[in-house]
């Protein structure tokens, strides 16, 4: 995304509090923070002697991070905004958004512009730049389905690079940027390919039930209907992080092979599962946690949400260590009872 040049020195905020920059609302402090509004500022970091030798952390909405300690480095607050149609052909629109653009606002904008496709991903917290890192997904859709490419800056060199889907190596809630590329790049712009022929994604019962409750037959649903249904479902199930600190779903839904699933089903016939195209089986992590009796329980100021067992919350004053201790206790109980490993979605620092 073209950005105006910015040759001014980076403005550093010393001893910057981070509670307002993570959706858990966990108190932590960064040695420095800097607000990044232009790609050129990322590109110049490696030449700035004040920060070049320090650890660097790029933060968007802070919806996928748990701070267990202060950050002894510079936190780069990605505020690169903007959204535009960069081109279109007979089949699709190619839409670009800045890395710091709020994700939900971007999804709503695409609908307002008559370019549907992302509506199942409505109300997911965070920014556009964070979406490819996590390969966000919900209600039968992963971001990678509409991903075209992104521009990222390598922090150590200031070099801008283009990544296509193959280079991003997307997996389930995973990508190159969570593995080999972790901490190395800042995503400054993402381009999505939105087909002009809309294909509704209505494979999840929650969505069709919500449509039915609104008197809308699935085969008559519009993109706006699906968007509104998903927003209503998420608001009913998930706490607002502005009111109750959380990072959305804390654990990935585990994927196991067929043999392991057969053994598990023999022990737990009611296990909630979703067959995958490759023969593996995805399990509902929330069901596993609920069966272990964790829904609504707390360890100190960290707790499992009373309506959604996948969501861990900060009841007020919880530290990252508190959240991590709760997560580990849940992992232990699920492992002992079901022989299944739960993997956290957020990055714990």
From Swiss-Prot:
<dbReference type="GO" id="GO:0008360">
    <property type="term" value="P:regulation of cell shape"/>
</dbReference>
<feature type="domain" description="FAD-binding PCMH-type">
    <location>
        <begin position="25"/>
        <end position="197"/>
    </location>
</feature>
<keyword id="KW-0285">Flavoprotein</keyword>
<feature type="active site">
    <location>
        <position position="345"/>
    </location>
</feature>
<dbReference type="InterPro" id="IPR003170">
    <property type="entry name" value="MurB"/>
</dbReference>
<dbReference type="GO" id="GO:0005829">
    <property type="term" value="C:cytosol"/>
</dbReference>
<dbReference type="GO" id="GO:0071555">
    <property type="term" value="P:cell wall organization"/>
</dbReference>
<dbReference type="GO" id="GO:0009252">
    <property type="term" value="P:peptidoglycan biosynthetic process"/>
</dbReference>
<dbReference type="InterPro" id="IPR016169">
    <property type="entry name" value="FAD-bd_PCMH_sub2"/>
</dbReference>
<keyword id="KW-0963">Cytoplasm</keyword>
<dbReference type="InterPro" id="IPR006094">
    <property type="entry name" value="Oxid_FAD_bind_N"/>
</dbReference>
<dbReference type="Pfam" id="PF02873">
    <property type="entry name" value="MurB_C"/>
</dbReference>
<dbReference type="Pfam" id="PF01565">
    <property type="entry name" value="FAD_binding_4"/>
</dbReference>
<keyword id="KW-0132">Cell division</keyword>
<dbReference type="InterPro" id="IPR036635">
    <property type="entry name" value="MurB_C_sf"/>
</dbReference>
<comment type="similarity">
    <text>Belongs to the MurB family.</text>
</comment>
<keyword id="KW-0560">Oxidoreductase</keyword>
<dbReference type="InterPro" id="IPR036318">
    <property type="entry name" value="FAD-bd_PCMH-like_sf"/>
</dbReference>
<keyword id="KW-0961">Cell wall biogenesis/degradation</keyword>
<keyword id="KW-0133">Cell shape</keyword>
<dbReference type="GO" id="GO:0071949">
    <property type="term" value="F:FAD binding"/>
</dbReference>
<keyword id="KW-0274">FAD</keyword>
<comment type="pathway">
    <text>Cell wall biogenesis; peptidoglycan biosynthesis.</text>
</comment>
<dbReference type="InterPro" id="IPR016166">
    <property type="entry name" value="FAD-bd_PCMH"/>
</dbReference>
<feature type="active site" description="Proton donor">
    <location>
        <position position="249"/>
    </location>
</feature>
<keyword id="KW-0573">Peptidoglycan synthesis</keyword>
<keyword id="KW-0131">Cell cycle</keyword>
<dbReference type="InterPro" id="IPR016167">
    <property type="entry name" value="FAD-bd_PCMH_sub1"/>
</dbReference>
<keyword id="KW-0521">NADP</keyword>
<dbReference type="GO" id="GO:0051301">
    <property type="term" value="P:cell division"/>
</dbReference>
<comment type="function">
    <text>Cell wall formation.</text>
</comment>
<protein>
    <recommendedName>
        <fullName>UDP-N-acetylenolpyruvoylglucosamine reductase</fullName>
        <ecNumber>1.3.1.98</ecNumber>
    </recommendedName>
</protein>
<dbReference type="GO" id="GO:0008762">
    <property type="term" value="F:UDP-N-acetylmuramate dehydrogenase activity"/>
</dbReference>
<feature type="active site">
    <location>
        <position position="173"/>
    </location>
</feature>
<dbReference type="InterPro" id="IPR011601">
    <property type="entry name" value="MurB_C"/>
</dbReference>
